[in-house]
Amino acid sequence: MQQHFQGSALARALVVGAALAVGAVAGTPVSAQAEGDTIVLGSAISITGKYSQEGKNASDGYNFAVKRINEMGGVKIKGKTYKLAIKYYDDESTPARTAQLLERIINQDGIKYILGPYGSGPTKAAAPVTEKYKIPMVESEGASRSLFTQGYRYMFAALSTSDQYLAPVIDLADELARKSGKNPSDMKIGMAFENDPFSLDVRQGVVDQAKKFNMKIVVDDKMPRDLSDISATLTKMKALRPDIIVFSGHTKGATTATRQMKELGVNASIVAMTHCESAKLTTQFGAASEGILCPTQWAETLKYKDDVFGTAMDYNKAFLAAHPDYKIVPYQAAQGSGAVEIWADAFRRAQSLDTEKLRDALAATDMQTFYGNIKFSAEGNNIAKPMVLRQIQGGKYVVVAPTKYASEPVVYPRKAVQ
Amino acid sequence: MTRRSLTLHLLILAAGIAAPFLFPGHTVQFAVFWIFVLFAQTWDTMGGQMGYNSLGNITFFGLGMYICAVVQIGLVYNVGEYTAATGAIKVDFTNQQYYTGLALGVFLAAIGPTIVAAILSWILLGLRGPYFAIGTLGVAIAAAELTSAWSWVGGGSGISMPVFPGGPGMRERFFYAACMLAAVLCYLFLRWLYSTRFSLAINAIRDDEDKAEALGLHTVRYKTVAWSVSAFFLGIAGALFGNMTGFIEPLETAYPTLTFGIFMVAMTLLGGKGTLWGPIIGATLFYTVRELTWTYLLGWQYIALGVLIIVNVVYFQQGVLGWLQARKPHWFGIHVDTRPDRVAKAGSKP
Amino acid sequence: MWDNLQILGNAPVFNIQLLLNGMSVGAVFALVAYGLALVWGVTSVKNLAQGDFVMMGGYLGYELSRHGIHPMVAIVPVAILMFAYGWLIYRLIIRRVIQLDLFTSLLATFGLAITMQQVLNLVFGPDVRTLKSGFGRFEMFGGMVDITQIRVIAFGMCLVLAVAMVLFLKKSRMGQAIRATAQDPRAARVLGVNTDIVYALTFSINSAICGVAGVIIAMIWVIQPFYGIAYSVRAFVIVTAAGLGNFPAVIATALGLGVLEQYSGFVLGAQFQQATVVGLLLLILVWRQTLLRRHRLSLQ
């Protein structure tokens, strides 16, 4: 028993040596607030992991806006022109990693301007870090309402909050029911949500609206993250025949739901789900996706415009031209571009690189972008941009609600898929 | 302890204390390093010393994390309300509340998993070899799934941890010190433990459990204690990690079976299991490689990791320490008798 | 939960839906499980990468379908390609861990699993993918019960493969060699069996079976580089419960597991499905252990 203590002298040396090696590799912190003529923004985002598709959508949006702004001459501060650049790290879709990487971005890389990660979980982990270091973060991919109840002063969210995603569906259901002479509180709701922060917030929004109209929820299942089979849940829906069916389970949830609804012959007069676009429902499922309602943060038919991209339709055209691997523009990309525009606008108004001045400038934002109107509440969320509902009609996404933005009337009730 | 080894111990301690001041930007990463060291050591107690390879030790890590969170929050607020998706309450912990919560939380995070380990021992320790491994993996997955389904602790939405009072910089150093302390205490404790008859007993269990039982060893008792020791330290690590990260949730942060859970094993194998320093060396090497690949081989990091595990397991079984022992046995106090006309006495293995 | 049970009581036709869904799911699990059992029984290697072999098969099928080959037809080339891949992996990795202790082989295949997942992710991206079989569905009981034709086909294929495997092992020379090696490798070697080839063949057959399962899964559900683990876990549960040598038991257990999952999803809620599977695993392990302990005690 005694021997191994003596002999591990070498072992100890190895440990010390390795520790020093780590230190050497770590190097000295670099102050990257503005190197020469470049303003560097930092982002820990899902390059790999379960949100890597959405992370790619978002980062493509970030990059597209940076490129366009730089082409247009960059950002002028006190007469000097700066180009924008983004430094990315992979948070592997894991909140713990997001927090660690942000510490590194802020402390080691010395970056003072943050673009948010993808997803409510990672954003929830990121916000306390940026708050602690008083580093402003503009995020456009973390919609959880609980992000905005903590009184964060350094986080600004361009997107509508998660509880608003499917709540308009219930409003619409109420409206349609009354129009066709039915009593809204007779309507039954069947729903399934993935068990993660974002989807559960979406669920809460639905639950709150249902309570408001006195509608009964007859199926309320949570989809575990690794399963791609919801046939048991759908069998329940078949048995209980809800009038409204809603799903939120990110891209995988939308794919699985659409396919299995068709396979099991499940339908309702109103069917809604999130992430239709990222699931590419129209191309994957064709006729089986007809009539599905899809909330979106942004639609290219909306009448917003700005000086960087023009109208929403202009952005749509330009993005698709620059990214041939996309058939439609996912709203995560549009949001990402919007976030960069917000930063650029803040730099211009603050005419400074100082984080406190920028924070104040961000808080005072009041602008229209191709993505939507941007105005932040005291808690940091965007109160000027509503969620929009689109319906798949003839293989295309058509805005149907809120009615003042609608391009077409909603098709109701949804026809069963053959 | 010899003078030379004492010096080396102190050198390492000094390096550990100096690190956050020399490289302040990396403090949190270094804290994770200490957690890795703790992971490897505790895994080795069961796997290397006792031969019971557990793939589910991460259960105690996650349990500790959640217990600490619940205690920290529950002392001041209603946990159910705190974690609810709506109507979030305005949260403001005073310094005193935070520190008492943390202290009590860490304490209970150590005790809780220990008790759970004792219970699990009773259920699972009758299984041998790969069945034990699979069984423990099952427990870890079940823990993650059940926690996800439990809305009182936030379910899939997770829990936002109370914010550390004190300025930036202080928080990282505080948790770094705590993690380092946990790892060092674990080392000292295990070092003592391995010098007692306890280690002889668990090694006997590893070498041949049936014979050990036949010789009158209360194997059940030893196995339970070994696992409880691991659980104790893992619980503390979980509590600290949860606070450091700021936001916890079941599948990836608390019960990451496919990452941390397996890293524990890989690190120990890399360094050489069944020795005191093997796991520590393994943890250091593994951690270094991981940080390097994460930064410079982005997109390929897991491939590099997978290949490392395969190579290690297939070609390099005995780990770094074992390899060194074979090459330079005299460094380890093993005397190999090379006189040609005597039967070679291989000396006792540590 | 009670409401859901009531539904089953009031409208028994839904039991049929659950049964049919469950058995078609179970049939696919059965495929994955007997490959695992075969490898485990013959080589003692517990292949933690089983689910990832399945995913790889699915992706190969996907790639072939992008070149216009119908997935059902693609099954044959996929099986061949996966067989070759299995042989390669055997030569590089598995061969060296067979003689080593059992936990080591577990870890080696785990390393393989991680590598395969990441390579698939890099090559195909993290999107979920699905294949169109182009088949319709059967409606029964006035539309109350639906089952897609592809599920019925999958069920049929599993049965056919099961019978084929059993016949192969019982009647052919190679099958006998495999069984001999499983029983006692040293004795088999003494009798002239080339155990190395037997091991390679076994592992490659497993790889091919996984490939076929993968294509089927892509047609019925979705594939994604990181979804393999769900299938690995279930395969392990089934093999642990059914025991290694007993193919009929593997099928029965697999079907049972599929049905149990559907029922637990229906009655308790989908969030408990995975927990049910894992809980079952633990129960079986513990029950096994109590049986063994009683056996040991009775010997004393």
Annotate each predicted stretch with a short phrase.
Chain B
Residues 1-350:
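Transmembrane alpha-helices and adjacent helix-loop boundaries
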